[in-house]
């Protein structure tokens, strides 16, 4: 939560897309390197070695935090002008990008939990060798495309412009996984589906965060970051649980098919938001809120 809010405070607005994209690059790179390294250390040196190493890395992070430059944080000022401004509830401003992100993270919860065993069930020989690196493939694609989304946002000055294309890309990716498992096709189609979804998920992560930063004033970037993390993590947990429950009754293909349906629901949500964008609520002095206030008076 704090890193995203800090990046928003440190970075100039014209570079905010790349800055948030770099969060994904370093997070993804760290996972790609240290997840397999941790498994190797646990097998060869024992689990204690992994916890000790993680603790030492934590101290390194603490030392780096001491080098963060001091900044003047933007705060909401309680003056007469602020009192007279009619504000819109936060949830109205961030509901669409947050819920759309949840549809992605729900599908990611299913992919991270069940894609590897599904691959082994489809092709025991090649599935066993590929299953161990599938999360790295998804994470690598997400890392690259998240930074790409940040570059596009900085150049166009329009955060959220790639949200709908990323949803279509994710639907194709998860749909490919579901259809491959249903038809028992080549396992390489699963790899393609994972790459497509990973790339789409990376774009969606950055677009959701930038959209929230864009819709909320600068003094509320901490709220935007917290909301982003809440919906991301809750979606991952819901996806693992709800779609996992479907595996028992409908198989892996049915669970991923349900993931496609969830992504389609998110696409309809963002499409409606895009069409109604001209009348979308703003952070202050929204017409609908003004009329409602006048009726009460």
Regions found by a protein language model. Give the residues of each.
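A membrane-interface helix-boundary motif in multi-pass transporters
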Residues: 43-55, 247-262
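Cytoplasmic helix-loop-helix junction between adjacent transmembrane helices
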Residues: 1-25
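Helix-to-loop junctions at the C-terminal end of transmembrane segments
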Residues: 146-158
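Juxtamembrane intracellular "pre-TM" segments in multi-pass secondary transporters
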Residues: 70-97, 287-297
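C-terminal membrane-cytosol helix-exit motif in multi-pass small-molecule transporters
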Residues: 56-76, 269-273
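Short amphipathic helix-loop junctions that connect adjacent transmembrane helices
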Residues: 113-129
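Helix-loop-helix hairpin linking two adjacent transmembrane segments in secondary transporters
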Residues: 23-66
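Structural signature of the two symmetry-related core transmembrane helices
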Residues: 161-176
């Amino acid at each position: 939560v704090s890193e995203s809010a800090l990046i928003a405070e440190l970075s100039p607005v014209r570079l905010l897309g790349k800055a948030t994209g770099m969060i994904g690059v370093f997070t993804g790179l760290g996972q790609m390197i240290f997840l397999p390294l941790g498994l190797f250390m646990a097998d060869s040196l024992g689990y204690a070695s992994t916890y000790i190493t993680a603790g030492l890395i934590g101290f390194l992070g603490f030392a780096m935090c001491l080098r963060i430059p001091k900044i003047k944080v933007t705060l909401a000022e309680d003056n007469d002008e602020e009192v007279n401004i009619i504000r819109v509830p936060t949830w109205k401003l961030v509901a669409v990008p947050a819920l759309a992100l949840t549809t992605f993270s729900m599908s990611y919860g299913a992919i991270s939990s069940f894609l590897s065993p599904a691959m082994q069930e489809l092709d025991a020989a090649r599935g066993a060798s590929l299953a161990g690196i599938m999360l790295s493939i998804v994470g690598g694609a997400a890392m690259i495309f998240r930074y790409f989304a940040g570059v596009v946002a900085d150049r166009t000055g329009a955060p959220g412009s790639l949200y709908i294309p990323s949803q279509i890309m994710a639907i194709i990716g998860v749909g490919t996984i579901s259809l491959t498992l249903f038809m028992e096709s080549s396992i390489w189609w699963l790899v393609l589906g994972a790459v497509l979804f990973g790339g789409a998920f990376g774009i969606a992560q950055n677009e959701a965060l930038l959209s929230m930063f864009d819709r909320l004033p600068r003094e509320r970037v901490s709220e935007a970051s917290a909301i982003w993390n809440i919906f991301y993590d809750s979606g991952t947990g819901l996806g693992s649980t709800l779609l996992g429950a479907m595996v028992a009754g409908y198989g892996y293909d049915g669970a991923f098919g349900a993931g496609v349906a969830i992504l389609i629901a998110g696409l309809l949500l963002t499409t409606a938001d895009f069409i109604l964008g001209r009348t979308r609520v703003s952070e202050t002095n929204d017409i609908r809120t003004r009329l409602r206030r006048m009726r009460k008076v």
